[in-house]
A protein has these predicted regions:
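Charged, terminal alpha-helix-loop-beta segments
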Residues: 1-358
Length: 358
């Protein structure tokens, strides 16, 4: 049976790193000195304790600082992320994700509506630009080469104290006839999260999401509009999509045309702003390496293992999001103050698809 503490310590040992003080407690909700009781009175209690450990480990592992480590382990030619991915597979830890179960009775009680009235200036007063971008993609509905977006910030918690996050975007891929669990990564200064973290986060959310609720829901605006599409058909199949920016550019590098957002300063949302230097996102860097070299072969193997143990997971897609400055489509009419000079429509480009072999 899985022991969360022992599993995490083993992974840390593999990358030559000590578990930091209070890390187990703050990330997994488990004290470092906790000892599993081998004298449980009933098998049922043991099973319940084991499931608690599974939830602690699998649902929260993507939050650990080690999955975002970049570069090489001291004194070796091995990337941190590669050794972590390899250990998850070789020690069968990846199988623990397969045991996660949804806990929220209704994911679609948020009232999200494609046509809700929005003021672009009020929307942009927040520094949480990734969430704002998710909303803008939701309001756009169809994103070329990504799919039809029917919800954003989909909640997974059953109660407030649950540690689970929210799915950035839910989409429908009409080409491959599957739902898309979309993990969006964006920062105006360039996102620094590793692909390992992105994949584990997306997979955790997939397991904690009750996909059958899409079919049973009767009230959610996005699902109602999805059902009206001529190429839509309900399915049990899904894909994981890692969606990211290529780079954030200064003006001289074409930022006015290519940056995903220009209203990046909340106190001056009526004017365009740019980063102080052009920065390529970590996801784009690693995706190029995944395609062009064997630098991330253990990540590839981890993705293949995830797909092998999930019969309804068709593929994992790595997708770059782009500003569609040539689009002739009309802007979302529900967004007051939307400007072609300052705001964007979006398109996507799939860089890599890892398919299920099943």
């Amino acid at each position: 049976m899985l022991d969360c503490k022992e599993a995490y310590e083993l992974i840390c040992k593999a990358i030559d790193r000590k578990v930091k003080f209070n890390e187990l407690e703050t990330i997994f909700g488990q004290n470092k000195t906790d000892i599993k009781n081998d004298n449980e009175k009933t098998k049922k209690v043991k099973q319940e304790d084991n499931y608690i450990d599974i939830k602690r480990f699998a649902a929260n592992f993507y939050k650990t600082p080690i999955v975002n480590y970049k570069g090489y382990i001291n004194g070796s030619k091995n990337l941190y992320s590669e050794i972590i991915a390899k250990t998850l597979v070789s020690e069968d830890f990846v199988k623990e994700w397969g045991k996660l179960k949804p806990v929220r009775p209704n994911h679609f009680d948020t009232g999200h509506n494609h046509s809700e009235s929005v003021d672009i200036n009020k929307l942009q007063i927040s520094n949480r630009k990734e969430e704002i971008l998710a909303k803008l993609l939701f309001y756009q509905r169809g994103v070329k080469d990504l799919g039809y977006i029917f919800d954003y910030q989909t909640p997974l918690k059953a109660v407030k104290s649950d540690s689970y996050g929210k799915i950035d975007l839910l989409g429908y891929n009409s080409k491959d006839k599957c739902y898309s669990i979309i993990e969006l990564k964006y920062r105006p200064s360039g996102s620094e999260e590793t692909l390992l973290r992105c994949v584990l986060e997306a997979y955790s959310y997939y397991k904690l999401f009750g996909l059958n609720q899409i079919e049973s829901d009767q009230d959610h605006n996005g699902i109602t509009e999805l059902r009206a599409l001529k190429d839509y058909k309900h399915t049990k199949n899904a894909e994981l999509v890692i969606l990211f920016d290529e780079k954030s550019c200064i003006v001289d590098d074409g930022g006015a045309e290519t940056n995903l957002m220009l209203r990046i300063v909340p106190k001056d949302a009526s004017n365009p702003h740019y980063p102080t230097k052009t920065v390529e996102s970590q996801q784009y860097k690693e995706c190029k390496e995944l395609i062009d070299s064997s630098k991330h072969k253990e990540l590839q193997t981890l993705c293949e293992e995830i797909l092998a143990q999930e019969p309804h997971l068709k593929q994992i897609r790595f997708v770059v999001l782009r500003a569609d400055t040539d689009s002739k489509s009309s802007y979302p009419t529900n967004i007051k103050g939307w400007s072609r000079k300052l705001d964007r429509l979006y398109r996507a480009e799939t860089l890599l698809t890892i398919p299920s072999k099943g």
